Amino acid sequence: STNAKSEQSAEDIIKNRKALFSKNYNTAKKVQSLSSNGDFDEAKRLMLEMSENYITLKEMFPENTKEGFKTEVTPLIWEEKEKFNSLMEKSSNDMVQLISTIEDEDDIRGTLGKLMWSNCKACHSKYRLPH
């Protein structure tokens, strides 16, 4: 809810969104490993989790979180809010697509590259400070 978000401090929001992006990255590595080993049920469960996290992340960039508290995002997120949100939605939708197609893919690595890792890269190259 909007009220709960406004009551949350900028510091908490920044820490939480960093933790969620970090979690998605670690989950993506697990998805890669599980899918490569044919453990699709667990991989799909994690894909769904990632998909939901991307939707949550859209709400984690209020105006008061542009700087401070070791945030690693560029101000461009707020200037291009619709583009950023679209990228989060695409990332979420691509994970859902993966759930329904991953078992039938011949090239699992390539498919994960296209539908999972490319979204990480697209966002990082544009909206994350170089580090």
What are these regions (language model features)?
Residues 8-131:
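Sequence context surrounding c-type heme c attachment/ligation sites in exported
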Residues 2-8:
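Sec/Tat signal peptide C-region and signal peptidase I cleavage site
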